[in-house]
Amino acid sequence: MSQAKRIKKDVDQEESQALNSLLDHLSKKYNISKDLILSSIPDAKKFDYDLKIYKINPQEIEDEIEAFKFNQTKDLITADEIFSIIKDIMANKNKEEKKLGNQTGKNKNISYQNAPAKKNNITINEKINVKYNTTVVYNEGGVEMEKQFNIMNPLLDVGNNFHLIEPYDLIPKDALIQKNGYQRYFSEIKDKFLRENEQYKDEKKPFDVFVLFLAFDVIDQKPTYDDLVGIDPLADFKKYILKINTNTDNIFLVSGQITYIEGNLVDNGKTIEVSKLKNIYEINEYSIPYKDVVQFYEKSSDPFAIYYMNGPYFSKDSKDFSVFNNVLKNVAIKNPHLFIINGPFFSTENEKVKWGELDTEEGMIDIIKKIKDEFIKTRTKILICPGISDNENFYPLPQPPFDKINNFFIGSKGNSEIIFISNPQIFPLNEAYIGIANFDVIKDIIVNSIHSSEINTVDKACEMILYQKNFYPVLPNTTVPKYENNQERVATVDLSQYNYLNFDRIETNPDIILTNSAMKTFAKKIHGTVFVNCGSFCKGNNYGEIAKITLHNPSKETKETDINKRVKVEFIKINQINNSKK
């Protein structure tokens, strides 16, 4: 009798629905047989019991598995590794419960505050023109879309002064204090917060007040609440130990999160007993009057159609662009208004690129020509955004547009159908703002966070972007490209340019944010912003999905103008497109 069958026989006849459901979920998700996962569990009865006691849900396990795969740079996971990850989750929860049992005193009822979203009315001029003094119209008889990009987010004009950052310690101080870098960014954020919140400057309060960014005093390890510290960049990066009670619902703290803190300074000024945490931005949701919105749709009754996809576009050990070319052809037939094509196009993780077997410069010229030829007779505007592993745009974030650094794009500059953008980027589309973050900020936030167990970490990661008004609110970033023998690494973010990742220049948060995460595909409404992740075009040797986003015209009957109530997101399997008639 196999080990799996012996274990099955030992388990009660009425095996719990929770265990069965979990095994079915993991088996289907990771393509491992249910029996094999069960065979890796030494004591299935105890495992079943612990699942109930610790209230472990499949999403929590899935998040940890994805983080493990990402950190280990693995595409697959074994049954033994799955069991080990679940065991670690149980151990951490047991540790937290013991810690809670020992905590007493004034720190018990800590207040973790995320202010409820406020909804206000705002005119179209207040939302767009006041900030950028530009016309943002696109319809069949309106202003051409490329005019919208003239004076947008300065990410378009950051120039070529980028450099890679050497391996770093917990707090890369030298990088943080450079011109226009994190120190200046932090100072502006703090001043703005205190200016707009006079009540927090009252020095007569019976507690101490701080504005700090959070960090974890460990590197390349899963942090715990014991590792939490607060850093003050404006006081020579002074570090405070933060004593925080974990008995709080909905808590989610990220390394790099700028936070207002109330508490008591103890231990000769080294430790803060935290009583209150608050994000430095509130999330404001806005409605634009119907009369301001309808002007964009008077000349066209068609819903606005957007397609977007993320590289890489061929497998790690291949150089075959035939599927990519076929998708271009099929999207061109659909004739959408906008097609967003994100890199990487020639990823440094591809073996043939890594060893110089491909001429990536000529390859990029061929790609641009192919895109131009396919869409030359359509109404479609093409946006091309680099990826952080692009061989022809190998800069840390924020990345400049391809045409800012590569002369070989001069020949296509006159083509009104193709527009090169930065990574990240915000641009206006009629009355909406769309943000593009072509990097795995969702996973990076989750990996660099501590949180209570009963939360949706993906939702909280999206929410953190909005509360920090920053496309990459993570510092230091531990998920960075690894090089030969995993000995050397460089930072994902150029910290001297960190202020360019902030989007507090716009009055509202973006209406739609497009991401590129290894997490499963999703479309989520988070406080009025629709987050869309379609994953990568090519995953290992398999093909993923692209996204179609439809923005419907405002209804004459309901006069509904909120973008998140008018948008529809569909994920289309690439194999389905490739197998259709060419």
What role is predicted for each listed range?
Residues S2-K582:
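Extended recognition/assembly regions associated with phosphoester-bond processing machinery
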